[in-house]
UniProtKB/Swiss-Prot annotation:
Name under which the protein is recorded: Small ribosomal subunit protein uS7
Cross-referenced SUPFAM superfamilies: Ribosomal protein S7 (SSF47973)
Gene Ontology BP annotations: translation
Keywords, sorted A to Z: Ribonucleoprotein, Ribosomal protein, RNA-binding, rRNA-binding, tRNA-binding
Cross-referenced PROSITE patterns: RIBOSOMAL_S7
A GO term from the CC aspect: small ribosomal subunit
Pfam families the UniProt entry points to: Ribosomal_S7 (PF00177)
Self-association state and partner proteins as the record states: Part of the 30S ribosomal subunit. Contacts proteins S9 and S11.
Alphabetized NCBIfam families for the sequence: rpsG_bact (TIGR01029)
Record-stated family: Belongs to the universal ribosomal protein uS7 family.
Role according to the record: One of the primary rRNA binding proteins, it binds directly to 16S rRNA where it nucleates assembly of the head domain of the 30S subunit. Is located at the subunit interface close to the decoding center, probably blocks exit of the E-site tRNA.
Length: 155
């Protein structure tokens, strides 16, 4: 085990939108080290968002992430031979990571033709409080609410 926590590395802002969130999204989309492909997908999707909404695409991304970010999650805790699902608060950084992960996961499951269209539509759905990634957040919250009785096992 480590002696101390690994230091957090700074996130570089992306060159087009000057946003750390966009950089994180590019890195989540990334497969097989093909960063230029990932950037093309993200920038293309943000451009579609700009055309459809007529507003700043980074604002749309932030709104979408705000609707997907979980406040609570359940973590397994073993107590005397039984495993309980204990609801815990989610740290802001982890909430962001989970939101991005869910967005990308459900983007890949969509049925549109190109990845650019899928990402754009998932972002727009999430910004409007719709879509599979928002449902995932609600399911996570429901699970935490259902297991509130075990909240005293929190650590």
């Amino acid at each position: 085990m480590r002696k101390s926590a690994a230091p957090k590395r700074p996130v570089v802002q992306d060159p087009v939108y000057k946003s750390e969130l966009v950089t994180q999204l590019v890195n989540k989309i990334l497969i097989g080290g093909k960063k230029s492909t990932a950037e093309r997908i993200v920038y293309g999707a943000l451009e579609i968002c700009r055309e459809k909404t007529g507003t700043d695409p980074v604002g749309t991304l932030e709104k979408a992430l705000g609707n997907v970010r979980p406040d609570l999650e359940v973590r397994s805790r073993r107590v005397g031979g039984a495993t309980y699902q204990v609801p815990v608060d989610v740290r802001p950084e982890r909430a962001n990571t989970l939101a991005l992960r869910w967005l990308v996961t459900f983007t890949r499951q969509r049925r549109e033709n190109t990845m650019i269209e899928r990402l754009a539509n998932e972002l727009l759905d999430a910004a409007n409080g719709l879509g599979a990634s928002v449902k995932r957040r609600e399911d996570t919250h429901k699970m935490a609410e259902a297991n509130r009785a075990f909240a005293h096992y929190r650590w």
